[in-house]
């Protein structure tokens, strides 16, 4: 998945504190220990810190952990995962899509909603 670098946020930001964020995935990919991402099919385990090097190409980022700054709308067919971008992480922000891409992320838990407990 490609992240477009916003004109107002051209440089990476270093997180001065843990940042709350959310990922979205399909309901059938979630299990008690983790989940599988929608686009890259990456297997995440809950409460584990994942690290990568950001892949930057001109005005886009081609490698990194994507997440949302606002909790997305959930349905019967998807689940929302609460995550943290840990303090000290390098990240970019795009306000048009309320989206982050970071070099570190910690998936914490599935967020409960009216469709599942």
Regions found by a protein language model. Give the residues of each.
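Short amphipathic alpha-helices within nucleic acid-binding modules
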Residues: 71-77
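Solvent-exposed, well-ordered amphipathic alpha-helical segments
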Residues: 22, 27, 109-117
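Residue-level signal for functionally critical sites in structured catalytic/ligand-binding pockets
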Residues: 61-69, 102, 107
């Amino acid at each position: 998945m490609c992240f477009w670098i916003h004109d107002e946020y051209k440089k990476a930001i270093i997180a001065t504190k843990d940042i709350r964020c959310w990922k979205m995935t399909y309901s059938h990919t979630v299990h008690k220990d983790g989940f599988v991402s929608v686009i890259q099919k990456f297997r995440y385990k809950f409460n584990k810190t994942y690290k990568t090097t950001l892949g930057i190409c001109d005005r886009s980022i081609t490698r990194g952990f994507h997440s949302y700054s606002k909790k997305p709308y959930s349905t019967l067919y998807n689940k929302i995962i609460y995550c943290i971008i840990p303090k000290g992480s390098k990240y970019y922000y795009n306000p048009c899509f309320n989206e982050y891409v970071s070099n570190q992320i910690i998936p914490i838990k599935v967020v409960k909603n009216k469709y599942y407990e």
